[in-house]
Swiss-Prot record:
Coiled-coil parts of chain: none
Organism per entry: Shouchella clausii (strain KSM-K16) (Alkalihalobacillus clausii)
Protein name: Probable nicotinate-nucleotide adenylyltransferase
Keywords linked to the UniProt accession: ATP-binding, NAD, Nucleotide-binding, Nucleotidyltransferase, Pyridine nucleotide biosynthesis, Transferase
Pathway connected to this protein: Cofactor biosynthesis; NAD(+) biosynthesis; deamido-NAD(+) from nicotinate D-ribonucleotide: step 1/1
Length: 192
């Protein structure tokens, strides 16, 4: 039986903050692996211009090459349409019935959990692990494991903004992700 962390997100693009959270999850919750799960269409975020699923998958895969306990899972990209966590977890539990799943979320998402589709069933299928930033105001919940986490002020939207302005993104993403963005010109003209 493996202890597997599921880390869902748009990963548009994946950045070092994502990797730091996954690394912290390995030790804080004693996980065997962390699976990055790029969403097809996030139900809670409407953003025009979402980079293609293939490009986001490739960027995540490129970002993970240094850590053998990280992998990318394309289950939601294959399914297409809106990505609901309950559907993903049901499918994974069916495929991997002996494994224990932990769902990684930001502390800011904890207060929104009651609004998630199928949340009562989901709480039976996974353990939620929330990464709390210092000073965050997430309500303590008995069915959520909180992990204190130093805030890393990197976001995918900040990286896209920097690229749009022709600013470098080195030290925000891995070199492999930076190279892929440049080769495919994923976010418009970028110089570095």
């Amino acid at each position: 039986m493996k202890r597997i962390g599921l880390f869902g997100g748009t990963f548009d693009p994946p950045h070092l903050g994502h990797l730091l959270i996954a690394q912290e999850a390995l030790t804080a919750v004693k996980l065997d692996e962390v699976w990055f799960v790029p969403v097809s269409t996030p139900p809670h975020k409407e953003r025009a211009g979402l980079t293609s699923g293939k490009d986001r998958y490739d960027m995540v895969k490129a970002a993970l090459v240094q850590e053998e306990r990280f992998r990318v899972c394309d289950i939601e990209l294959i399914r297409k349409g809106k990505s609901y966590t309950i559907d993903t977890v049901r499918e994974l539990k069916q495929t991997y019935p002996d494994d224990e799943f932990f769902f990684l979320i930001g502390g800011d998402m904890v207060n929104m959990l009651p609004e998630w589709r199928g949340i009562d069933e989901l709480k039976q299928l996974v353990t939620f692990v929330a990464f709390n930033r210092p000073g965050a105001s997430a309500k303590s919940q008995p069915d959520v494991h909180f992990v204190p986490f130093v805030e890393v002020n990197i976001s995918s939207s900040l990286i896209r903004e920097r690229l749009a302005k022709g600013k470098p993104i080195r030290y925000f993403v891995t070199p492999a992700v930076e190279q892929l963005i440049e080769e495919r010109n994923l976010y418009g003209d970028n110089n570095e």
